């Protein structure tokens, strides 16, 4: 039975019951009239009964419509208020160079697939409020169901109160039950101070729900406006954070508080703008040119990920072209024979990825390591690689954190990890030791050693010292380990170089070695 038929059936049953009650009452009145007709002394009572019957009949007819009329009127009024609010929101948001919450939903989902949940929850038509400051619902991204909650800055500054918190938590529960991803569109002034601790407690509930969903379903956050105070931990707990060059801000304490507490004068963008969190702090994973670019990136990431940890990543039809086969054969030409000569690892990745397509993650952060998604033979994979073009592909505090975080994400959602190794080791220096290189390096080991997905490691030129062990080595659990072979003359030349360097080093009390 379709939902429409079920609704029609539910509406029909009460109408039948009301009709039966009406017939019963009407027949009872007629029986009384017939009985009283034999008693002439009670003529006045007959007239009174007739009048009462007439009134009852009129009241019964009115009662058939009375339960529905107020509801219909309320829904119509709420819809009218919603249309007016959307027009007002469009005017305000466009003046700031931003889209409305509903316009963002149109960009995120396949056309015509969004279905809202709890549209009028938290509203008060008597006060002229159609709904609360968050929109929740489900739609489709490339044909697969995805949940969303979008904060509406045009309603009370997008602040979070009891109604908003309950809607978000309900959406999270539904998404976990359905095992579908959740996308958060953040544009909020934080907790609604008028509601006091009750508003703050809603953040606690959202934190808990986000942690419960972590590793179960993919969670993406798009920062499309302000996100300050405790609210920043909502996106920080998700898998991927996307920001824009303008209007995106994240910070625990804002510029005014910083100035009052420390005397430092700093702008919102300098404190926690999109560029800062993509290139400096490493909090975010992508910096969009604008909202449309950021949302398109989110759609792309969702295309590589499964709907939940219980599902496999989607497979894509693929047939290698002649040009791609020729590109793959150029791999040995891209990697220089001299192990100290830099090259662009992205060229290597494009040689092995379907159609040469590679979606980088955290492109601007810790550039000596490269991570991202690609397809090989139509199957999505995660790729981790050293970047010889930046600091010779060395591992440091930030790149270790970047690699570990990405490997854990791939492992959570069943994506095989391909590791392309070309690194001279860990970056030396007191700054690295003081910043916790031991702790961060251990995270990389933990990520690889605990991964349950297929691990394939390819050593392109060199893998020295501790960096060799942590970068997906056989010793910590890689399933397949390969090495790119050089031409014999290259190896011979490198061997002669080692002998020459060794003899010189012996005279000086030290040796210099280079891999081939």
Briefly describe each language-model feature range.
Residues 2-516:
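Ligand-binding clefts of soluble mixed alpha/beta catalytic domains
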């Amino acid at each position: 039975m379709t939902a429409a038929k079920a609704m029609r059936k539910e509406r029909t049953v009460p109408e039948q019951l009301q009709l039966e009650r009406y017939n019963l009452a009407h027949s009872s009145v007629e029986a009384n009239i017939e009985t009283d007709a034999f008693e002439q002394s009670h003529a006045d009572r007959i007239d009174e009964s007739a009048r009462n019957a007439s009134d009852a009949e009129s009241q019964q007819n009115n009662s058939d419509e009375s339960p529905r009329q107020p509801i219909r009127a309320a829904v119509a009024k709420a819809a009218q208020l919603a249309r007016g609010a959307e027009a007002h929101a469009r005017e305000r948001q466009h003046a700031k160079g931003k889209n409305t919450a509903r316009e963002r939903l149109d960009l995120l989902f396949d056309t015509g697939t969004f279905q809202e949940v709890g549209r009028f929850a938290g509203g008060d038509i008597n006060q002229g409020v159609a709904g609360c400051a968050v929109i929740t619902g489900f739609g489709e991204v490339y044909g697969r169901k995805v949940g969303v909650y979008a904060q509406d800055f045009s309603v009370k500054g997008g602040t979070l109160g009891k109604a908003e918190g309950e809607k978000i938590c309900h959406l999270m529960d539904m998404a976990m039950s359905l095992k579908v991803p959740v996308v958060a569109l953040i544009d909020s002034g934080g907790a609604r101070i008028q509601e006091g601790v009750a508003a703050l407690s809603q953040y606690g509930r959202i934190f808990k729900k986000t942690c419960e969903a972590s590793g179960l379903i993919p969670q993406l956050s798009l920062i499309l406006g302000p996100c300050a105070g405790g609210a920043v931990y909502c996106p920080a707990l998700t898998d991927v954070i996307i920001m824009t060059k303008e209007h995106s801000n994240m910070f625990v304490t804002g510029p005014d508080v910083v100035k009052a507490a420390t005397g430092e004068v700093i702008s919102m963008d300098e404190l926690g703008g999109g560029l800062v969190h993509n290139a400096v702090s490493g909090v975010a994973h992508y910096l969009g040119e604008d909202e449309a670019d950021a949302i398109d990136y989110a759609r792309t990431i969702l295309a590589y990920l499964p709907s939940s940890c219980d599902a496999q990543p989607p497979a894509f039809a693929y047939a290698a072209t002649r040009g791609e086969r020729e590109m793959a054969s150029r791999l040995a030409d891209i990697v220089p024979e001299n192990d100290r000569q830099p090259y662009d690892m992205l060229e290597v990745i494009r040689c092995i990825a379907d159609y040469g397509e590679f979606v980088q993650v955290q492109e601007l952060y810790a550039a000596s390591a490269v991570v991202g998604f690609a397809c090989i033979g139509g199957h999505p994979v995660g790729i981790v690689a050293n970047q010889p073009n930046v600091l010779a592909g060395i591992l440091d505090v930030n790149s270790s954190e970047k690699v570990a975080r990405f490997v854990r994400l791939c492992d959570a959602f069943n994506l095989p990890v391909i590791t392309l190794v070309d690194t001279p080791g860990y970056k030396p220096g007191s700054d690295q030791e003081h910043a916790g290189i031991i702790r961060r390096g251990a995270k990389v080991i933990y990520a690889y050693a605990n991964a349950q997905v297929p691990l394939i490691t390819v050593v392109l030129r060199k893998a020295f010292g501790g960096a060799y062990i942590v970068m997906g080595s056989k010793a910590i659990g890689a399933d397949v380990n390969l090495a790119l072979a050089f031409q014999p003359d290259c190896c011979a030349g490198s061997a002669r170089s080692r002998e020459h360097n060794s003899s010189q080093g012996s005279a000086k009390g030290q040796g210099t070695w280079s891999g081939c």
